[in-house]
Regions:
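Conserved N-terminal/central alpha/beta ligand/cofactor-binding core
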Residues: 24-25
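A short, N-terminal amphipathic alpha-helix
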Residues: 1-10
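Conserved beta-loop-beta/alpha segment of the NTase-like Rossmann-fold superfamily
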Residues: 19, 29-32, 41-131, 174-176
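Catalytic-core segments of class I nucleotidyltransferases/pyrophosphorylases
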Residues: 83, 97, 101, 105, ...
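Phosphate- and divalent-cation-binding pockets in alpha/beta enzyme and binding domains
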Residues: 18-19, 68, 189, 220
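Short internal beta-strands
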Residues: 9-13, 113-114
């Protein structure tokens, strides 16, 4: 909400109903608050009641990739541009989404969060090449490739899980062929849009990146967040 977001859509599977229950299990929260009289839980419940008015859920029951997950929201998204956040990629200490929205409002185009990664790990990321520098932290993107091999990667500049995308990407995703691992990759559709002349900006964010995509990374991230 600090970034000005007014509607949130969670894309979950039937196995992840616990996320939905977190927002809608009023009886549980009221029981715990009454029993423990914990002010922190009461404050958290107050936040949840506020946010759940903004939230919708859609289901991706078969894991067919990030692109397929985003496509599930097609009927809900009404604006020309929308923000996508991947839960495996956390950015703390600075509000990356707010910074990206500010850039989008100025440049009127798509924006993606980015950072330098170890050259030996480029095959884990969407990797892009720069077309033109805007300033030291923002660049127009020339091309982007999903998980390239180390030798053919255009750089070690990686896209991190924050995207401001145009609504027209849904047409690309609908017709997108399966990519690596048999999944629909959002990077492939972004690449097609760039080839069509759509402008994309990479934003090197100021916050701290936490990788929650592995159990080891999740544990480290939990420790880091609990330091606050």
């Amino acid at each position: 909400t600090q970034a000005g977001i007014k509607e949130i859509v969670f894309i979950i599977s039937k196995k992840k109903e616990i996320i939905k229950k977190y927002f809608y299990n009023d009886a549980f929260y009221k029981r715990i608050i009454k029993k423990k009289k914990d002010l922190r839980i009461a404050q958290e419940y107050k936040k949840i009641k506020k946010y759940k008015k903004m939230i919708k859920f859609v289901y991706q029951n078969n894991p067919k990739g990030t692109g397929d997950a985003v496509l599930k929201t097609k009927k809900i998204i009404k604006d020309k541009f929308f923000l996508v956040l991947l839960p495996d990629d956390l950015i703390i200490k600075k509000n990356c989404s707010k910074a990206m929205i500010s850039i989008h409002n100025k440049k009127k185009c798509s924006v993606m969060a980015s950072m330098k990664v170890n050259k030996k790990t480029v095959n884990r990321w969407g990797i892009f090449s720069k077309k033109k520098n805007i300033n030291k932290n923002n660049f127009y993107i020339d091309d982007v490739v999903e998980k390239p091999n180390i030798k053919s990667a255009p750089s070690n500049d990686a896209v991190i899980g924050r995207y401001i995308l145009p609504k027209k990407i849904f047409t690309k995703l609908k017709n997108q062929k399966k990519g690596k691992g048999g999944e629909i990759h959002i990077t492939d559709s972004i690449r097609e849009l760039i080839n069509d002349g759509e402008k994309f900006i990479a934003h090197n964010f100021d916050g701290k990146y936490l990788d929650c995509g592995t159990m080891k990374g999740y544990i480290k991230s939990s420790i880091e967040i609990n330091k606050k």
